[in-house]
Amino acid sequence: MIKVGLTGGICSGKSTISSMIKEAGIPVIDADIIAREVLEKYPDILLRVRATFGGHFFDWRGDFRRREFGNHIFRFPKERIKYEEIIMPYIKEEIEIKLKEYEKINTKLVVVDGATLIENDMHKDMDMVVLVWVDKSSQIERMGFRDKLSKGEAINRINSQLSLERKKDYANIIIDNSGNLIKTKEQIDDLLEFFTLYQ
């Protein structure tokens, strides 16, 4: 079974491309969805989050305030690393379980979609890595539009991840998503055609 890592950066358009791949009938394991699922499946994670970061990220019912916590770890990269040290082993384990399930039913190719695939060394378990690339000015502009952030806030969030330029060094295939949707679609069609070689 061929394992393809799909990664990108904030506002690079990775989610749109992931959706296009799914629509083509290719199985996609989404690390963001798994990150939400493991919080429910493994109560130990939130116990460790409370012990490490304090109770103020939980409301009066004890529910986790994800948005506030997300904003906090984006502002303080060392805090994000601490959180990833807690949650990543669970995410990796769940991805591995899902990959084995696909392998059991003789799936030929699976895509693992993860924004921090490279930062968390998951690219090493992939047969190839596809990077959704966009220039930094487009990233900043899209973030301001999507998330209503100031230019300074957008730059801080972008800088909290490994740069797309650095990620290029790890990629086998690069999708340039800085143009219009038609150009991106052409590249996706080429990618899907390439995938058929393995299916």
Curated annotation (Swiss-Prot):
Signal peptide: none annotated. Belongs to the CoaE family. Pfam families: CoaE. GO terms for biological process: coenzyme A biosynthetic process. The gene is coaE. PANTHER family: BIFUNCTIONAL COENZYME A SYNTHASE-RELATED, DEPHOSPHO-COA KINASE-RELATED. It comes from Clostridium perfringens (strain 13 / Type A). Pathway: Cofactor biosynthesis; coenzyme A biosynthesis; CoA from (R)-pantothenate: step 5/5. This is Dephospho-CoA kinase.
